[in-house]
């Protein structure tokens, strides 16, 4: 088993499975999202996972502007030239359990090798895990990497209507990227 598979099995899979169990409907589909606390719970779960990754030069902060859905900014200082922004989201669309195949449920992580089934695992819960693990593996290999900033929102499935005020408010923190990578498979 290579190192990325080890991290997937021992670290990402358990956390991503917990993420699947959080309904976390996007604000358009759950008007009481703030009271429900599920969007915040997805960010908190991901931050707990980040804490255990041993990534050098990493910091993160959850942001909340007024009544807007929360945004997480993760910054990993570069050891080489360049700046990259990685975009991802943690909110989900409503699901209809009756439309799922036998033995599957949107809020229950099911592993059928090599696939993991559950709402939000592909669109788009994996994004932050992928980015952070990629940088972790580069660091473990002693390879230089650019400054990496992740912006992870919780309103994408509603059309990202909460994102523009954050982009404006966090403009300095987001830096001057050479590249923007959108980690959204649209699954």
Can you say where each PLM-predicted feature lies in the sequence?
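Acidic/histidine-rich catalytic neighborhood of metal-dependent amide-processing enzymes
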Residues: 120-187
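Acidic/His- and Gly-rich active-site-bordering loop/insert found
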Residues: 1-119, 138-145
């Amino acid at each position: 088993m290579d190192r990325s598979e080890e991290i997937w099995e021992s670290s990402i899979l358990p956390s991503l499975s917990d993420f699947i169990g959080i309904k976390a409907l996007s604000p358009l589909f759950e008007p009481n999202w703030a009271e429900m606390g599920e969007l915040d719970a997805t960010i908190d779960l991901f931050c707990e996972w980040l804490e255990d990754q041993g990534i050098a030069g990493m910091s993160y902060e959850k942001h909340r502007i007024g009544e807007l859905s929360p945004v997480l900014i993760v910054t990993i200082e570069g050891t080489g030239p360049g700046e990259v922004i990685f975009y991802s989201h943690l909110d989900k669309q409503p699901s209809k359990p009756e439309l799922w195949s036998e033995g599957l449920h949107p809020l229950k992580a099911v592993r059928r090798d090599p696939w993991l089934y559950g709402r939000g695992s592909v669109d788009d819960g994996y994004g932050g895990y992928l980015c952070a693990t990629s940088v972790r593996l580069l660091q473990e290999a002693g390879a230089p990497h650019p400054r990496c900033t992740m912006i992870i929102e919780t309103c994408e499935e509603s059309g990202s209507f909460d994102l523009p005020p954050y982009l404006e408010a966090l403009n300095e923190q987001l830096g001057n990227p050479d590249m923007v990578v959108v980690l959204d498979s649209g699954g």
